[in-house]
């Protein structure tokens, strides 16, 4: 029994000893493995530093053979391990070395070739100079003549280089211009496509006629007149007629033979009020007889018509703001502006109704601002109010008028519009848009100028599109004659062979003399463009000029930047009298009533 116990004890001790030995061996192997990786890592770093000094693959292999880690008598690793490590480094690093060597060789070759080319060019230039000097000597030229010849030749070289540079710059500028033009065309096409109100030509009349029925017995007839009606309205020594014309600021033409009274005025607002006032006078005469027709009735009818007109204008303005979604807009600081907006309905510009034009411009501006990620509402207000200055007249009607100190004439509607916007404390961007839509400089430094530019574009698109304004045939003929007179000068100088005017004078095709040089062509385009833009009438339109030589080229005049006010069918602005009275927003009262 004791013997068995001893044997078991020896067995356990042996097992423990064996386990201890195994653990020791395992730890030793791990230690060597760790040391191997550390040595490998250290070697790799050393090798990378040395690679920078090595120029070819053979030197790399020799260097690796000399390293202690790759010696065959190393006791820690086998030759197979060393071979694998060596091949690994060679494969990774040799390609890099070869590529660097190749790039270096190519760089050296390029540098050498450049040097050779420069030397050859220098020698060639020197030889040319020598040949020219020799030639000049053989020609027996004086020093000054030779110097002049050389300078002329030098100028020719410079001119050729300059022409080449100009062509390159023109090509780059045209490419950039075409890219911008394409983007702008897309933007404007989208803007016009979103406009719901595209009006046609509207003829604003400067004369209104009241026609009467001459009846003595039938009191039911409307606008009936008695025998003495026309005499009474003219008055003794034409006093009543003169008083009406002075108060209404219109011209009255009485035609008893045709039972008509015509009212004439270039101020369409005054024309509308005078028409309504005269109808009130006639109604009073119909109801009470001609004995009531005196200055008191005339004043009462005039001021009553003024108040009715103000109320109607305010209603139209409020409806306009509601239709555009601006009635509660934060950019409309007061509803009093509604009356001035409504007055635009009774104004015309080149046969285009100003209110309709303003609404259309507002819709275009909104679409443009939407595509540019700007404030659509502000852009819409800017365009709607850009012609608001056309809603007022020259002077105030009474001391109660808000605009009694406004001395701007109606034809300077920009200044008047700025005055209105500043009085009602509109946003500075809106004020500057009103001020700048005809090319003026902005008033406020902090205002955002792109709203003014959008307003100007919207105004132009609405006013200039085909069909919106009436054009007389003699205007087209006059435009053709003006263009022909300008082009004839260049035909006489044999720069232009022939020309053709197309599209009512908006397109001009020119056949250029094939013998002219590039510099002469450039000068022709500049001179012709300047001649067209300096003409008062032609500067109002963008005219495209196509030049035909060996290749086709196209130039467009920038007429819009120099455009003056267009010719109107009637001139409501120029017909303003010095004593013209303003229709202010106050209530009009007759002191005698």
Curated annotation (Swiss-Prot):
- List the signal peptide residues: none
**InterPro entries named among the record's database cross-references:** Diverse_Catalytic_Enzymes, HD/PDEase_dom, HD_domain, HDIG_dom, KH_dom, KH_dom_type_1_sf, Ribonuclease_Y
* Residues passing through the membrane, by range: 6-26
Q: Report domain KH positions.
A: 218-278
Catalytic EC class: hydrolase
Per the UniProt record, which EC number(s) apply here?
A: 3.1.-.-
One molecular function GO term is: RNA binding
Write down the membrane topology. Answer: Single-pass membrane protein
Q: Keywords assigned by UniProt?
A: Cell membrane, Endonuclease, Hydrolase, Membrane, Nuclease, RNA-binding, Transmembrane, Transmembrane helix
Any GO CC annotation of this UniProt entry: plasma membrane
Which cell locations does it reside in? Cell membrane
> Does the record bear Transmembrane helix in its keywords?
yes
A GO biological process of this protein is: mRNA catabolic process
Please describe what this protein does: Endoribonuclease that initiates mRNA decay.
Return the similarity comment: Belongs to the RNase Y family.
**This protein's name:** Ribonuclease Y
This chain's source organism reads Mycoplasmoides gallisepticum (strain R(low / passage 15 / clone 2)) (Mycoplasma gallisepticum)
């Amino acid at each position: 029994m004791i013997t068995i116990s001893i044997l078991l004890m020896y067995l356990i001790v042996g097992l423990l000893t064996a386990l201890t030995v195994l653990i020791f061996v395992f730890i030793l192997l791990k230690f060597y493995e760790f040391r191997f990786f550390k040595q490998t890592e250290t070697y790799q770093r050393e090798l990378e530093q040395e690679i920078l000094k090595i120029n070819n693959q053979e030197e790399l292999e020799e260097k690796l053979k000399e390293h202690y880690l790759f010696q065959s008598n190393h006791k820690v690793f086998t030759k197979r391990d060393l071979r694998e490590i060596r091949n690994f480094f060679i494969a990774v690093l040799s390609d890099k070395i070869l590529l660097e060597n190749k790039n270096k060789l190519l760089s050296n070759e390029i540098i050498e070739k450049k040097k050779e080319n420069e030397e050859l060019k220098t020698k060639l230039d020197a030889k040319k100079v020598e040949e020219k000097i020799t030639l000049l000597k053989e020609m027996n030229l004086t020093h000054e003549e030779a110097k002049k010849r050389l300078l002329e030749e030098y100028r020719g070289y410079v001119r050729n280089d300059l022409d080449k540079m100009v062509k390159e710059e023109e090509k780059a500028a045209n490419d950039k211009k075409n890219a911008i033009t394409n983007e702008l065309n897309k933007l404007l096409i989208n803007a016009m496509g979103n406009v719901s109100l595209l009006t046609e030509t509207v003829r604003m009349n400067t004369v209104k006629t009241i026609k009467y029925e001459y009846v003595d017995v039938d009191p039911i007839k409307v606008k009936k007149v008695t025998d003495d009606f026309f005499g009474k309205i003219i008055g003794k020594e034409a006093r009543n007629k003169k008083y009406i014309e002075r108060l209404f600021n219109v011209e009255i033409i009485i035609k008893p033979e045709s039972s008509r009274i015509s009212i004439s005025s270039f101020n369409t607002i005054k024309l509308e009020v005078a028409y309504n006032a005269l109808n009130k006078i006639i109604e009073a005469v119909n109801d009470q007889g001609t004995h009531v027709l005196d200055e008191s009735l005339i004043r009462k009818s005039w001021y009553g018509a003024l108040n009715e007109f103000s109320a109607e204008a305010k209603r139209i303005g409020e409806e306009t703001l509601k239709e555009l979604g601006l009635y509660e807009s934060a950019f409309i600081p007061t509803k009093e502006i509604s009356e001035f907006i409504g007055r635009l309905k009774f104004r015309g510009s080149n046969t285009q109704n100003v209110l309709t034009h303003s609404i259309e411009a507002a819709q275009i501006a909104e679409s443009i601002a939407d595509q540019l990620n700007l404030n659509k509402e502000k852009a819409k207000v800017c365009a709607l109010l850009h012609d608001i200055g056309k809603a007022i007249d020259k002077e105030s009607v009474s001391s109660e008028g808000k605009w009694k100190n406004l001395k701007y004439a109606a034809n300077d509607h920009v200044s008047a519009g700025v005055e209105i916007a500043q009085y009602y404390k509109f946003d500075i961007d809106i004020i500057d848009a009103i001020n700048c839509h005809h090319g003026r400089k902005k008033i406020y430094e902090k205002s955002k100028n792109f709203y003014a530019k959008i307003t100007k574009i919207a105004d132009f698109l609405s006013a200039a599109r085909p069909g919106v304004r009436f054009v007389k045939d003699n205007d087209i003929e006059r435009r053709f004659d003006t263009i022909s007179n300008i082009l004839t000068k260049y035909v006489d100088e044999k720069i232009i062979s022939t020309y053709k005017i197309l599209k009512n004078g908006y397109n001009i095709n020119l056949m250029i003399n094939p013998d002219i040089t590039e510099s002469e062509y450039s000068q022709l385009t500049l001179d012709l463009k300047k001649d067209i833009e300096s003409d008062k009438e032609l500067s109002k339109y963008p005219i495209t000029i196509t030049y035909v030589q060996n290749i086709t080229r196209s130039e467009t005049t920038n007429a819009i930047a120099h455009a003056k006010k267009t010719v109107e069918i009637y001139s409501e602005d120029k017909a303003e009298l010095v004593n013209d009275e303003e229709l202010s927003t106050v209530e009009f009262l007759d002191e005698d009533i």
